[in-house]
């Protein structure tokens, strides 16, 4: 099988960007890989090596994109990193811009930010999968986190890369939107020759279309194994992570002195609207001292908006 990306005993030239052991990893044609490890394990350093971000000592990364019209690594590998619900779509965007209408002047709509398509048929496939037609006239700052994820993927994939690397693709998405994104990625790889590499912190996030897993821990790249072998080797997680005694001690921790109010949060007929869209309408909400709440809702339902009010992060 042809390897599209291959590194043997790779060591970054700069000490700050080195893994703790030389990296040997090959990704074959048709493989879809998950790089899995805890935060700080070295996953991003490994990806930086695979995309040729930093020069290596002696051995370099070898690429084989024989079926591509371009031989450039930058044309064949695209990398998207997501930090939170709103990712990195635009460096000038900030969450409260939604509420400052004067700051929205000149904010582009989705259609303005999509590049020229190299392949019109592929563009139609993408637009159909991601439902982009309905978003084209929508300002970027009005997209929900799920919609923004679709926009970012479409913008990147219009360049027709051979490999798409996504770092933290499911961060900030609710369960339904995570499942939708996994389904869209599966349909995408079934309809095209695209290969996907996902960088994940939790093994629970690995989609079933992944063929192989590369575990990373303590800045060491583990051996690539099949998804089945990786899942079989996972330790069994106990039903309870804390004993009842420890849970009780945590719940019985005293409040700080001075917290005497019975009402911690009190909202009375709160409404928030931007443009023609109403996010919160005449909301009454009281949180009493000692209560523990969970906010639940789909992406775009208004959870972050409500929390911004509670945290006084609003104009």
Regions found by a protein language model. Give the residues of each.
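The feature captures the beta-strand-to-loop junction immediately N-terminal to the Walker
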Residues: 36-38, 296-298
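Conserved ABC ATPase signature
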Residues: 139-147
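ABC ATPase nucleotide-binding domain signature region
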Residues: 44-118, 307-315
